[in-house]
Swiss-Prot record:
Transmembrane feature ranges: 18-37
Membrane topology value: Single-pass membrane protein
Biological role: Required for the export of heme to the periplasm for the biogenesis of c-type cytochromes.
Transmembrane listed as a keyword: yes
Name of protein: Heme exporter protein D
Top-level taxon of the source organism: Bacteria
Length: 69
């Protein structure tokens, strides 16, 4: 198997189309990174909301038991 490029400089130059190739790479990677960060933030927010709701329900149950006693 022969390499497509003879050197790293040739690889980064992409046969004279470096601007377009690397611009396409950047325009693909940035949205993917944003998507991952947003997904992680949403996941944490959902878990935090569930924990708050469970705590609220536990407080309500405790208050109801205290009133009944």
């Amino acid at each position: 198997m022969t390499p497509a490029f003879a050197s790293w400089n040739e690889f980064f130059a992409m046969g004279g189309y470096a601007f377009f190739v690397w611009l396409a790479v950047v325009m693909t990677v940035i949205p993917l990174v944003v998507l991952v960060v947003h997904s992680v933030m949403q996941h944490r927010a959902i878990l935090r909301g569930v924990a708050q709701q469970r705590a609220r329900e536990a407080r309500l149950r405790a208050a109801q038991q205290q009133e009944a006693a």
